């Protein structure tokens, strides 16, 4: 705003004091007459001026204003003053003081009519070239008077003869007089009325002013005072003839004001009354029953005499006081006090105001406004406003439609009958600035309230001491608006909120439609729209001015109320602390930023009982701290990026982008320090109800297609420092997930995902059971090499790839250093699914949903922990590398999953309790802290292995090269899963105690939770009990020769057969079986057949047998065999496991697991892994040692049995036993040495360094199938079919010379014809559908095999496999639920046994046990045929094994004893000679009987000679080798000396290095003989030298006594070796098969 220089000082024309008083009066009278005459339509007569100067008062009535003068002084081209009237004009003048001029102007009944017109392009630009940029009417008045009255003033000066008195230009004098008049004039105005409208409609904007005064605060002061009372702004429209019944003037020809054109002096004007005016009742605004007539009315105006319609827009009924002053050339001071104001708007009013405002927007060709005067640079404001009330009337969707109107005026004044009223009220407003800075303005207010139909929606600052504030700043090129709200509350009843959004949508739509309607009805606006061209996109530079809006809320509370029913209410409360909202714009660049220090969400449920609302539940939904959200887009701009900086507040900074964008992008960035989410079923239900209510009530439904558009590329970034998710289940348990850091990036365009990245750091999860037990589920594993603050555990990534016309959409997931804990007793996954995803049984799952993305999971360096139900042990699976591929789900295809595991390590621990961890915690923490110093070169593998073993775990297995595929089908709501395992290499290494624990852990993990199974074995009720007794066969026992009257304890249990007679059932054995089965099994017909009394056949399937644990005598064995056992004669060459396949053919499976190419290597180690086992053994040994040292005479038979397998015998010669090294490997020293010396020995019971037994399983294959449940009797539930190509047990004991313990018999024809060595099929059935019990059917077959049994190896296996901890023994004594076998079929097989005796148990010999008697001999090539067995009705594996042993041992003893004795080395030759002699005589007889040929005699002679020679050579070779071995041992003893300690060495067999041909035998025999002779020579030649070293005769005799036997033995050793090697070479040349047998049987050297 430009300030005139004369306004700065009212006494600027002091030079006029030199003029005479008469001249001054005449000049002032002329100036006033010209000034008033210019304002009015007619000039003021000189007589009127004379009256003014004589009486000091001039009053004029019924005046018309000079609109040309008004248009000239108000130099805006779009404003045209068409008519103006004054009812009364009073001018007062203090004529006594002309120098200090004091003029008072009073105006009554001012009426102005302003018409907005489009700019006239024909006008010259010079007309407006000096127009002010802001209104300065006083300057324009002076300029106007200079143009119109300057010449008249000069003529007046000449006519009056004042040239001599006026020195200078009369033009300057006139300016001074006018300036003095205007500066010293005080204005009083009453009843002012202004109409603003356009020429094309009758609707006008009416501004009414009741009273206004404008004057100086004090005389000779620069301050001006403006007082206004009663301001009213309305939108009015005259009613047409058809509506009012009276004539209406045309819109452009007549004005709203009528008057007379005469002027006269009116007396008594002080008593005139002002016209009535429309007033607002403030109570009616606040009242909920406000009527529209308070704002819209049809009335008769006193002055207008015309009926009209009006809408009250603005009203201020109090006193408006404004004081402003000019302190310097560029400083303006304004003080103002504004009373309560009311603003009442609707869509028609806003559209009409926007329509009028459009005339003030210059067209491109309109001359601009410019000024050469300096702008205002300093401003001092102090404005106080009592209150501002804004009322907004919104039309509801069902209200009247505006588009049905054709008349513009009627449309603007059509008031809907139904609508919502929104009210906003602001109290105690103050606007000020500091330091006179116009670039910084501050606005404060005490409180702000928003109502909707008298219901409070928003309340800010009411309950706090500090006021709300708005600060406007302009600093350099940044314009900012800072809004500070100390506190507030937003309460949104959901019904009101939905009505609010509906009304807002209708409100904005009405404004838009009305604007378009008004623009189309105006030719000027229509022409502008037709010629308007959209601005072209422009490049935005970073140095353009920026505009910022910052809104800060210290405390904010948002409440959402939703009525679920008439008796239920849901309340959602958001509590926000320090909320910052920022919007920054630079040109077309725009960014929105939201920062929240703390935000919490709480949900509450209320029920109404007896008209009282009671809180039922309350829960916290989520909590955030220090969260930041920012969004911007690059639409129509150059490439730029946004960075966030923090000083006092967070604010975005625009920077040039490093890369160019291909098309517009929208960016969303979200960062939060702590994000905690708490979810319960109630919270989910309430949020779901809230979402459904909002979604169903939206005016424009939100769909995925409307959320995204393909024209934009959307980018989302999320950063979370700490994230936690808590899920509460129905049973009171909860699941908590926590991430220390989250990084998320996602890019999409429309509905197309472009890229995705999600990184989770330091992931952990816990499960809180119903009993408040905290169980860790997921945990992160730290890398001890690097002290990383954040460890990446999960990485999800996706990138859209297009190749060869097809989309390869794959989501990559990488999981590293993550641990998962599995608890069978806490099924947290099923609990979560039951709680949050309940399945409706009436709505089956028909098909998988479409998921067009492949998933590739890469799992590295992770651990899975398996926690049993009832044990303290734990199993760890260390997954070094695991790859999972999941195919996309498209078009109802099955779910395909492929799993590849390169290497997995299995660890186990016996007790996972605090006592175990306490000893390891300090060490582990120290190693973690100092890992970079102690372990700088450790790999991830070594580090995790170190941590696991430090906690007490033992590595028990390694699984490599696992390949698994999974296919899941969903057809008609039924799932069928096919799992295929194509490859697996398993390496197992364990001790006896860890093996026993592993079996128990796997059994515990595979078992199901205990359930009520009381109806499993209930007998069916007998409907007719009497009838059932009549069906008893009383002769049953008599027919079987059983005395049922005797003592039942002395009788064996007899099983009742269902149909067949037991006496007629016998075992039939084919005598010629051995002839056709094996050439080594001829002449089996000579064996005695089994009588029919030995076995009993039982056809029942539910029999229970009782088999004695030991084979005591023949009669007891026969009684034991009469218990549901059936021997079936068949040849194993024709054996098949297809007998059970017919029962499962054609059934639909639910789960099927197929596996093949599985290889298992199991290394059995001596010693013990667990500290508890070692402590028990060491304690027992220590007790025996103590008792041995105290008692000289101890029974040699005293012994202690530990763990059902370890026998510790008493011994007397033992010294101190040190148990401090009990955890060291057991093979660090020989235990025998400990017991042979009377010194301190170290007891070592730890795991042996080397394996003792190696079990190798090759090509394990088979399938496991689970079938759908059926209500049929004996329904098959599942079946297991398993087979293996080879099962080999290697003997690695140092005391054993044999290589294998068990393996396939390669000489058998069936081993060459069949691929699988062993095969088993187990079928699980349910006997009756109404019972829950399950029964098994087993079929097993094995090919002929060969066993090389060393007694030490056998003892180790027995001790290893029978190991049982006391806890497991107690468990077995509690009568567990053993599996029940309906039927067991064991197919026949052939076993060849070699057995080496080493020691015998004297107690066993005295008791007459068969195994101990057999240990006195050595067997080689003993052949045993195990017949096929069919067993019915057994419970448990123990009964099953006892039945097998009893039946097979009895059969071997009765029918195959000759085959067993044939393997005894001394007897084998006798049998061979006897069979040879038999062949000499039997073969010719059979030849003569057959074809009358004597050639069979020669064949018999050749066969006899071959067998005899081979056995003779083998027997002599064994004798020579045995003699050589004894001589070698004697030589070793003599060389070491009798007092030297025997060094432990690995047992070596001389048969392992035997020559394969006669040439090798002769060569090796010659070499051995030569070494023996050379050794004797060397010993003999060294004897004199050794005797000379001794000085005494005793030493010489001792040396000679030791060396002379060596001289004699060494040639004998060479000779026996020569004979042995020669005979072995000759025997192997004659028997090629024997060479292969020796290679398999004996260990090779090295």
UniProtKB/Swiss-Prot annotation:
Compartments where located: Preautophagosomal structure membrane; Endoplasmic reticulum membrane
Region of interest: PAS-targeting domain: 1465-1490
Disruption phenotype: Impairs atg8-processing.
Catalytic activity: a 1,2-diacyl-sn-glycero-3-phosphocholine(in) = a 1,2-diacyl-sn-glycero-3-phosphocholine(out); a 1,2-diacyl-sn-glycero-3-phospho-L-serine(in) = a 1,2-diacyl-sn-glycero-3-phospho-L-serine(out); a 1,2-diacyl-sn-glycero-3-phosphoethanolamine(in) = a 1,2-diacyl-sn-glycero-3-phosphoethanolamine(out)
GO MF annotations, alphabetized: lipid transfer activity; phosphatidylinositol-3-phosphate binding; protein-membrane adaptor activity
GO CC terms of this entry: endoplasmic reticulum membrane; phagophore; phagophore assembly site; phagophore assembly site membrane
InterPro entries according to UniProt: ATG2
Tagged with keyword Endoplasmic reticulum: yes
Family classification: Belongs to the ATG2 family.
Record remark: domains: The N-terminal region (NR) associates with the endoplasmic reticulum (ER) and is responsible for the formation of the isolation membrane at the PAS.
Protein name: Autophagy-related protein 2
């Amino acid at each position: 705003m430009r300030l005139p220089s004369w306004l700065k000082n009212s006494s600027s024309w002091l030079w006029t004091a030199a003029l005479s008083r008469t001249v001054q009066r005449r000049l002032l009278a002329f100036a006033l007459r010209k000034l008033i005459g210019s304002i009015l339509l007619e000039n003021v007569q000189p007589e009127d001026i004379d009256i003014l100067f004589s009486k000091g008062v001039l009053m004029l009535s019924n005046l018309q204003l000079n609109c040309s003068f008004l248009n000239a002084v108000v130099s805006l081209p779009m404003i045209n003053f068409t008519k103006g009237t004054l009812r009364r004009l009073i001018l007062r003048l203090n004529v006594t003081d002309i120098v200090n001029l004091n003029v008072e102007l009073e105006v009554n009944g001012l009426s102005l009519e302003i018409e907005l017109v489009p700019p006239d392009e024909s006008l010259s630009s010079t007309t407006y070239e000096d127009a002010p940029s802001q209104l300065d009417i006083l300057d324009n008045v002076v300029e106007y008077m200079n143009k119109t009255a300057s010449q008249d003033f000069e003529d007046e000066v000449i006519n009056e003869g004042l040239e001599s008195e006026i020195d200078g230009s009369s033009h300057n004098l006139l300016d001074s007089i006018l300036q003095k008049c205007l500066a010293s004039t005080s204005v009083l105005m009453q009843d002012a009325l202004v109409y603003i409208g356009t020429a094309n409609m009758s609707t006008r904007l009416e501004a009414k002013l009741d009273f206004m005064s404008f004057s100086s605060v004090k005389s000779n002061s620069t301050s001006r005072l403006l007082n206004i009372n009663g301001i009213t702004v309305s939108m009015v429209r005259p009613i047409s003839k058809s509506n009012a019944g009276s004539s209406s003037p045309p819109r452009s020809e007549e004005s709203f004001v009528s008057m007379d054109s005469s002027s006269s002096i009116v007396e008594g004007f002080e008593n005139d009354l002002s016209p009535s005016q429309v007033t607002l009742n403030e109570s009616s605004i606040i009242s909920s029953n406000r009527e529209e007539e308070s704002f819209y009315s049809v009335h008769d105006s006193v002055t207008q005499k015309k009926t009209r319609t009006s809408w009250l827009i603005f009203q201020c009924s109090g006193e408006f006081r404004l004081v402003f002053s000019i302190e310097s050339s560029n400083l303006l001071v304004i003080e103002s006090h504004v009373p309560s104001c009311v603003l009442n708007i609707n869509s028609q009013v806003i559209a009409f105001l926007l329509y009028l405002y459009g005339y003030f927007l210059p067209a491109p060709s309109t001359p601009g406004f410019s000024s050469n005067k300096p702008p205002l640079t300093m401003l001092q404001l102090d404005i106080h406003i009592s209150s501002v009330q804004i009322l907004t009337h919104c039309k509801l969707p069902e209200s009247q439609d505006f588009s049905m109107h054709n008349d513009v005026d009627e449309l603007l004044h059509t008031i809907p009958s139904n609508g919502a009223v929104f009210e906003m009220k602001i109290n105690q407003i103050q606007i000020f600035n500091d330091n006179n800075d116009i670039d910084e303005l501050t606005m404060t207010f005490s409180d702000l309230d928003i109502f909707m139909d008298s219901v409070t929606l928003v309340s800010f600052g009411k309950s706090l001491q500090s006021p709300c504030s708005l600060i406007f700043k302009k600093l350099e090129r940044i314009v900012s608006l800072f809004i500070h709200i100390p506190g507030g509350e937003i309460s949104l009843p959901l019904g009101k909120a939905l009505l609010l959004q509906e009304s807002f949508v209708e409100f904005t739509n009405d404004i838009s439609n009305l604007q378009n309607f008004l623009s189309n009805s105006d030719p000027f606006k229509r022409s502008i729209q037709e010629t308007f061209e959209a601005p072209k996109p422009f490049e935005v530079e970073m140095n353009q001015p920026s505009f910022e809006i910052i809104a800060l809320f210290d405390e904010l509370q948002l409440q959402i109320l939703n009525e679920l029913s008439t008796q239920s209410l849901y309340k959602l409360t958001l509590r926000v602390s320090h909320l910052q909202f920022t919007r920054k714009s630079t040109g077309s660049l725009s960014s929105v930023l939201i920062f929240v220090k703390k935000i919490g969400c709480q949900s509450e449920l209320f029920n109404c009982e007896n008209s009282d609302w009671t809180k039922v539940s309350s829960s916290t939904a989520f909590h955030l701290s220090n969260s930041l959200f920012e969004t911007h887009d690059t639409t129509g701009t150059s490439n730029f990026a946004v960075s966030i900086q923090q000083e006092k507040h967070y604010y975005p900074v625009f920077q040039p982008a490093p890369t160019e964008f291909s098309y517009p992008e929208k960016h969303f960035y979200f960062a939060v320090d702590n994000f905690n989410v708490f979810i319960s079923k109630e919270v989910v239900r309430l949020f779901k109800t809230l979402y459904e209510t909002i979604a169903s009530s939206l005016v424009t439904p939100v769909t995925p297609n409307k959320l995204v558009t393909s024209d934009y590329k959307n980018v989302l970034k999320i950063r979370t420092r700490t994230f936690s998710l808590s899920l509460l289940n129905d049973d009171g348990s909860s699941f908590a997930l926590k991430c220390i850091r989250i990084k998320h990036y996602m890019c999409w365009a429309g509905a197309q995902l472009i890229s995705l990245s999600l990184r989770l750091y330091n992931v952990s999860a816990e499960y809180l059971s119903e009993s408040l037990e905290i169980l860790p589920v997921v945990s992160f594993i730290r890398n001890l090499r690097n002290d990383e603050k954040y460890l990446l555990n999960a990485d999800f990534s996706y990138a859209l790839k297009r190749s060869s016309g097809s989309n390869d959409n794959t989501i990559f997931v990488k999981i590293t250093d993550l641990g998962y804990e599995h608890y069978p007793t806490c099924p947290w996954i099923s609990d979560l699914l039951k709680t949050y995803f309940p399945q409706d049984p009436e709505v089956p799952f028909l098909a998988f949903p479409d998921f067009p993305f492949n998933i590739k999971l890469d799992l590295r360096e992770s651990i899975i922990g398996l926690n049993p139900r009832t044990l303290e042990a734990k199993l760890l699976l260390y997954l070094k590398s695991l790859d999972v591929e999941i195919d996309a789900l498209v078009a109802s295809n099955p779910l395909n999953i492929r799993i590849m595991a390169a290497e997995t390590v299995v660890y186990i621990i016996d007790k996972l309790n605090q006592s175990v961890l306490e000893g390891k915690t300090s060490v582990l923490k120290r190693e973690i802290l100092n890992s970079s110093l102690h372990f700088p070169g450790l790999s991830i593998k070594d580090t995790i292995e170190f941590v696991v073993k430090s906690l007490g775990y033992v590595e028990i297995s390694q699984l490599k090269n696992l390949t698994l595929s999974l296919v899941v089908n969903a057809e008609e709501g039924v799932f069928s899963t096919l799992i295929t395992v194509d490859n697996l290499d398993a390496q197992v290494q364990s001790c006896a105690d860890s093996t026993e624990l592993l079996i128990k852990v796997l059994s515990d993990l595979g078992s199901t939770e205990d359930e009520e199974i009381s109806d499993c074995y209930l007998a069916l009720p007998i409907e007719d009990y009497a009838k059932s007794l009549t069906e008893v066969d009383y002769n049953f026992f008599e027919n079987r020769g059983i005395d049922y009257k005797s003592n039942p304890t002395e009788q064996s249990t007899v099983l009742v057969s269902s149909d067949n007679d037991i006496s007629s059932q016998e075992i039939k054995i084919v005598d010629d079986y051995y002839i056709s089965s094996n050439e080594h099994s001829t002449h089996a017909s000579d064996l005695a057949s089994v009588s029919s009394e030995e076995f009993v056949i039982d056809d029942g399937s539910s029999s229970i047998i009782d088999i004695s644990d030991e084979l005591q005598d023949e009669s007891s064995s026969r009684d034991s065999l009469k218990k549901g056992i059936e021997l079936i004669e068949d040849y194993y060459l024709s054996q098949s496991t297809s007998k059970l396949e017919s029962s499962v053919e054609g059934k639909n499976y639910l789960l099927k697991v197929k596996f093949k190419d599985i290889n298992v290597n199991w290394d059995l180690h001596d010693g013990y892994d667990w500290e508890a086992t070692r402590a028990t053994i060491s304690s027992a040994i220590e007790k025996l040692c103590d008792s041995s040292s105290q008692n000289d005479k101890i029974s040699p038979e005293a012994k202690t049995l530990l763990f059902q397998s370890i026998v510790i015998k008493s011994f007397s010669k033992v010294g101190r036993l040190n148990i401090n090294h009990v955890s060291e490997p057991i093979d660090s020293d020989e235990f025998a040495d400990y017991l042979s010396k009377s010194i301190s020995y170290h007891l070592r019971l730890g795991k042996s360094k080397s394996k003792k037994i190696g079990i190798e399983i090759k090509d394990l294959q088979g399938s496991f199938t689970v079938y759908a449940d059926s209500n049929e009797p004996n329904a098959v539930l599942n079946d297991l079919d398993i087979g293996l190509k080879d099962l080999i047990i290697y003997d690695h004991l140092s005391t054993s010379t044999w290589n294998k313990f068990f393996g396939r018999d390669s000489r058998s024809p069936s081993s060459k014809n069949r691929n699988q060595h062993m095969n088993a099929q187990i079928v699980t059935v349910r006997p009756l559908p109404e019972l829950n019990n399950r029964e098994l059917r087993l079929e097993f077959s094995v090919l002929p095999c060969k066993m090389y049994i060393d007694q030490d190896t056998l003892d180790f296996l027995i001790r290893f496999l029978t190991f049982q901890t006391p806890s497991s023994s107690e468990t077995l004594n509690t009568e567990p639920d053993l599996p029940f076998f309906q039927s067991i079929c064991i197919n026949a097989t052939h076993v060849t046994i070699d057995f080496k005796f080493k020691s015998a148990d004297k107690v066993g010999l005295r008791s007459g046990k068969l195994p101990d008697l057999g240990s006195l001999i050595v067997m080689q090539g003993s052949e045993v045929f195990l017949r096929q067995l069919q067993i019915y009705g057994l419970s448990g594996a123990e009964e099953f094994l006892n039945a097998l042993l009893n039946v097979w041992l009895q059969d071997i003893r009765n029918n195959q004893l000759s085959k067993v004795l044939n393997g005894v080395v001394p007897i084998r030759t006798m049998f061979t000679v006897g069979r040879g002699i038999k062949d000499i005589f039997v073969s010719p007889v059979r030849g003569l009987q057959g074809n009358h040929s004597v050639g069979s005699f020669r064949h018999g002679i050749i066969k006899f000679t071959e067998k005899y020679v081979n056995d003779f050579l083998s027997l002599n070779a064994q004798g020579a080798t045995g003699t050589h071995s004894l001589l070698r041992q004697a030589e070793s003893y003599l060389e070491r000396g009798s007092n030297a300690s025997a060094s432990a060495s690995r047992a070596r067999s001389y048969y392992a290095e035997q020559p394969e041909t006669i040439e090798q035998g002769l060569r090796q025999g010659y070499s051995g003989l030569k070494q023996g002779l050379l050794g004797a020579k060397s010993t003999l030649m060294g004897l004199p030298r050794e005797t000379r070293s001794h000085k005494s005769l005793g030493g010489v005799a001792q040396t000679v006594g030791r060396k002379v036997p060596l001289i004699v033995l060494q040639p004998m050793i060479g000779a026996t070796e020569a004979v042995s090697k020669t005979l072995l070479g000759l025997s192997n040349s004659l028997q090629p098969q024997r060479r292969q047998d020796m290679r398999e049987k004996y260990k090779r050297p090295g």
